[in-house]
Design a protein with these regions (language model features):
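Transmembrane-helix motifs of polytopic, lipid-linked glycan transferases
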Residues: 39-47, 152-176, 207-208
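Transmembrane-helix signature of polytopic, membrane-embedded enzymes
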Residues: 52, 56, 169-190, 220
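Membrane-water interface at transmembrane helix exits
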Residues: 20, 45, 136, 140, ...
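Short hydrophobic alpha-helices at membrane interfaces in multi-pass membrane enzymes
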Residues: 2-4, 180-183, 214-221
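Specific aromatic-rich, kink-prone transmembrane helix
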Residues: 168, 205-221
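Intramembrane catalytic core of multi-pass membrane enzymes that act on lipidic substrates
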Residues: 54-155
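Start-transfer (signal-anchor) and selected internal transmembrane alpha helices
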Residues: 1-68, 72
Length: 221
């Protein structure tokens, strides 16, 4: 009975604290972190499959997502481009119009130069869709030129969709006569958690809207 609480707690702490200390260039440390985390993940899948209720596992999924809001994306530097695009938007410019390397030559704004130095794709046009551009723009606008606040606000936006999936996925599985424990395959998946809430990659938002599609498909055939 208490095994799930022990494994769930260890899994949550390991994933979150590993994200806090992870380094993109240290492969060995990442491997030593992810191996036990994935072992914990598969143990939780096994336990949830044989448990009468999945409430505890859903609780873990929410707690981890909230905790990851307060971490820095140590395994990806893509977020600098997010805030570059947001910065361009609040200056009244089109983030798709010019490449960062073209815009920086005429900018005297210190924040622009700071973000530009951290970009991994200064020679490329933005690839992020309009919906994400709005999230980037309002994160920067609400953050008042503080990168740490921008990051926190954007993570809160992402968390709304991610936590939405925690509530949405079990409902969808029930509509399709599938066991609720199967939701944990996605909701507790370390790769999903790290990429979606840790590194701020937007695939989780797309999955949320895909899930809505399947919900409406069943509700309104």
């Amino acid at each position: 009975m208490y095994l799930k609480y022990l494994i769930g707690t260890l899994f949550s702490f390991s994933l979150v604290f590993g994200m806090l200390s992870a380094s993109q260039s240290d492969f060995v440390s990442i491997l030593l972190w992810l191996v036990p985390v994935n072992v914990g993940y598969f143990l939780l899948l096994y336990l949830s499959k044989n448990d009468r209720s999945v409430s505890f596992y859903l609780f873990i999924a929410v707690v981890i997502r909230i905790s990851l809001v307060f971490t820095t994306p140590n395994l990806s530097d893509d977020y600098f481009r997010f805030f570059w695009d947001g910065n361009v938007s609040i200056q009244g410019k089109n983030p798709y119009d010019k490449r960062p390397s073209e815009l920086i030559t005429s900018s005297v704004i210190e924040r622009d130069h700071y973000l530009f130095r951290h970009l991994n794709s200064p020679e490329y046009h933005s690839v992020y869709p309009p919906f994400l551009q709005y999230l980037f723009k309002y994160s920067v606008k609400m953050g008042n030129n503080r990168l740490d606040i921008d990051l926190l606000i954007l993570k809160v936006f992402y968390a709304l969709f991610s936590i939405g999936m925690v509530f949405l996925l079990p409902v969808i599985l029930k509509l399709y006569d599938l066991k609720p424990w199967r939701a944990m395959i996605y909701l507790l998946n370390p790769l999903v958690l790290i990429e979606e809430m840790g590194n701020l990659h937007a695939e989780g938002i797309m999955v949320f809207f895909l899930a809505l599609f399947f919900l409406f498909l069943k509700k309104f055939p």
